[in-house]
Structures are given as C-alpha cells and as structure tokens.
UniProtKB/Swiss-Prot annotation:
It is an enzyme of class 2 (transferase). Its cofactor is Mg(2+). GO terms for biological process: AMP salvage; purine nucleobase metabolic process; purine ribonucleoside salvage. CDD domains: adenosine_kinase. The active site is at residue 298. This is Adenosine kinase. Its EC number is 2.7.1.20. It comes from the Eukaryota. It comes from Schizophyllum commune. The gene is ADK.
Length: 344
C-alpha cells in the first residue's frame, strides 16, 4: 500500500545556474533580468554552459519546485511527482536533486529526447532565465494509467498541478482532476504565469470546475480577471470572490482561492463564505536579506501543500506557505535551508 499523500504533475526542468554570465548575455542577445522561452539562436547555450562554466544544478519546473517544498515539510514517502524527461544526464541530475529534498518521482522517460532545461544566468543580483521545454511537452496521458503510476494516483488524497502543463497536457490534467472530483479528493491548481489565463483561458475554464484550491499571484489573478471580463481586474478581493464562485463539479467541497502579492498581504476567499475576504500578513525581509525571489511562489505553494497534507487548518497552511517562501528567498533559486528548518 502506497504511503503517498500528494501527487504533483508538471514540466520537469533542470535549472543550470551560472555566475558572472555577462559574456553569455552578450553572445546570445539576452537581457540581464528576464525570463523567456528559448528560440533557435539560444539552443547551443545549454551545451556551452555545461562545458565551459561552473554549473550549479537545481531541480526546477514550477510543480516540481512546489513538490520539493512539500516534501521538505513532510515525512519521507509523502510526495510523488510526475512529468516527462529524456534519457540523458540532465534527468539523472534532476533525480539526484529530488533525492536530496526527499521527493520521489514517477517520470515518463522518453528515449532519444532531451530533458527540459532552464539556463539561469546570474549577473550581480539579476537573473536571466532561458527555458527549453524539450521532453517536458511530450508527456503522454497513458502514463497516468500505467502499472507504475495508476496506484499512486489512486492512493493519494491531494493533487497539485502547475498552470504551465495545460499548454500541452490538458487531457492529462482533466483526467487527474476528474478522478479527484469523483472521489471527493482535493485538486490544487496554480496559475503559474499571467500568460496561462491570458492565452489558455479556454483550457483553464474547462479545468476549473474540478479545482478545489486555486493559487495565483496578483499578476496571474489580474490576467484571469481580464480574460473573464471582470469589471475590476486589479481588485484582488473582488476577483478572488468571482473565481471562488465559478461553477464546480463537486459542490460538497467548497473552493478556496489564494492570491499572493509579493511582500503584501495574501488574500483568501472560501466559496462557503463568499462575502468574507481574509488577508494574511507577510513577514517582510530586509532588502539585504533577499538573495533570490525566483521560485518564491513555488515555495509558498510547497509550504501550503505540506501543511494541508499534514491535516493543518487553512490559516496554518497559508502561514506555512509564507514561512517556506521566506526561507527560499534567502537561497539561490528554489532551494531550502539545510539542516532542515521545522516548518510545521
């Protein structure tokens, strides 16, 4: 019998972090503080980084970051993650990074494909992110019903998915979310980036009836509000209410909407009490304590999920999210402190 409580799905990427990357920025025409998908002119960048620079490998990909965060908070064998990787050295690096955090993976491995990667080029306090999805967008729905994965899907009580996954894997997302709703389990969706509700709104709206908890930041909330024709897209409280009250397949389980807003208060609305908007203060860091905010949203989701899976109340789960995000912001990339800090 599986002991896993949380099943996460997304695009597995290995972050390749290099410092003093001014020459790389110049050579590949990159901005110092940016995040883009790789174009053809960037494709040699990854090999060059590995061969000619001192690389720090960090397991990346939004849902994988959140899954590692949840695993950091929970006992071993609590969290399992799936996504598609290639049969290459990057996948092995990814497995090693996950093992450090206590995250187990059930990858679909595509022979002859390259694992997705994100080049993180650091210059001073700036970070230029260049992502190539590669194998990540080759995920197959049949993997969810495979002999290795189906028992994991059935055993857990919680599911988590990044919004990025709907760009190529909507059928898989709907299968997982549908199973969750049918058994009155908890399905959590993170919007992940403003372009997801902006350009993939039909996919989001198709998935939403099965979603029990939505996590988004203020920009993603505004993008969803604009795409859905909301009259006041920057009014986080009003948007949270509207999102909470969208149609739901399993009305027995109320929908919770959580909007983070950087160092500002986190907004929470529960469809069981749509008139009540709750806010949670963020314990702000001094400017000098902030090392890297990349992955802070994923760390929040990880801490929140860890507490939720451990049976904590919603309030405590939001606070656990804040706590893990604060730790992550003081590290390079989406990483956590060792020896472990007690989150729960």
């Amino acid at each position: 019998m599986s002991s896993y409580k949380l099943f996460c799905m997304g695009n597995p990427l290995l972050d390749l972090q290099v410092r003093d990357g001014e020459k790389l920025l110049e050579k590949y025409g990159l901005k110092s503080n940016d995040a883009i998908l790789a174009e053809e002119k960037h494709l040699l960048l990854y090999d060059e980084i590995v061969k000619e620079h001192e690389v720090t490998y960090v397991a990346g990909g939004a849902a994988q970051n959140a899954a590692r965060g949840a695993a950091y908070c929970l006992p071993p064998k609590s969290v399992v993650y799936t996504g598609c990787v290639g049969d290459d050295d990057l996948a092995e690096q990814l497995k090693a990074a996950n093992k450090r955090e206590g995250l187990d993976e059930a990858y679909l491995v595509k022979k002859g494909e390259k694992t997705g990667a994100c080049a993180v080029i650091i210059t001073g306090h700036d970070r230029s992110l260049v992502t190539t999805l590669r194998a990540a967008e080759k995920f197959e729905q049949s993997h969810l019903s495979s002999e290795a994965v189906a028992p994991l899907v059935d055993a857990v009580q919680f599911y988590y998915m990044e919004g990025y996954f709907v760009t190529h894997g909507l059928a898989s997302a709907l299968e997982l979310a549908g199973k969750s709703a049918a058994k009155s389990k908890c399905f959590v969706l993170n919007f992940s980036a403003p372009f997801i509700p902006q350009f993939f709104m039909p996919a989001i709206q198709q998935l939403l009836p099965y979603v029990d908890i939505v996590i988004a930041n203020e920009s993603e909330a505004e993008a969803w509000a604009s795409a859905s024709g909301h009259p006041a897209p920057t009014d986080l409280a009003a948007v949270a209410k509207s999102l909470a009250m969208q149609p739901k397949t399993n009305p027995a389980r109320p929908r919770v909407v959580i909007f983070t807003h950087g160092a500002e208060e986190t907004v929470v609305v529960n469809s069981a009490e749509p008139g009540r908007v709750r806010t949670f203060k963020v314990d702000k860091l001094a400017e000098g304590e902030i090392v890297d905010t990349n992955g802070a949203g994923d760390a929040f989701a990880g801490g929140f999920l860890g507490a939720l899976v451990a049976g904590r109340e919603l309030d405590d789960s939001v606070e656990a999210g804040h706590k893990l995000a604060k730790i992550s912001i003081q590290q390079i990339g989406p990483q956590f402190k060792w020896p472990k800090v007690q989150i729960l």
